[in-house]
């Protein structure tokens, strides 16, 4: 049941992402540009950039678009300096929320983030109030039909933590430590194992159960946060109730 619950949460998140793909592209380009500016334009020497490229490819961004963003950042042509700030808080029902932002105006950003929390019964907390509930890790998703034995052998040898079947759909997910993510992705590609999506994410150590009404309110808050131009990523420990899943 734990696996099914986890897969339900992943599907829920990805359905929401698909509905906002245009906005996601804008944020991915910003991350690519800043990562290249801060660590250089060579992915093999810049783990943050490599993770950003893998995430962009996982969202079907073209190589040309990625390359342009990287060159703009590496060449110092981005528009001004950006501060990276993570806000922490709780939504309705005690759901823990991390909000990663990239901004050129901190006062504007914190006001907008606080408003989104307050509007839907949540509250913005202090630094460290919920971060301890999350661990940064890589997740690599495979559609049904992949050679599971080969997948497991290659992934674990490259430094993955686990290979797990998600729910009853036949999908597989590889989990990796943050630092091993790029090496595992490279090894899978070298072995001819094509994945559906790969990303570095913040994974909750515990999940907050919600009833349907609470889930609806929390989702509205997440939607509002993700619609903010300065917000890059929103992570929660919400466990979405079964009624929200399609039959």
Curated annotation (Swiss-Prot):
Alphabetical list of InterPro entries matching this protein: Integrase-like_N, TACO1_YebC-like_2nd/3rd_dom, TACO1_YebC_N, Transcrip_reg_TACO1-like, Transcrip_reg_TACO1-like_dom3, YebC-like
Alphabetical keyword list: Cytoplasm, DNA-binding, Transcription, Transcription regulation
Subcellular location: Cytoplasm
Record's GO cellular component terms: cytosol
Cited Pfam families: TACO1_YebC_N, Transcrip_reg
An example Gene Ontology biological process: regulation of DNA-templated transcription
GO terms for MF: DNA binding
Family: Belongs to the TACO1 family.
Protein name: Probable transcriptional regulatory protein ABO_0750
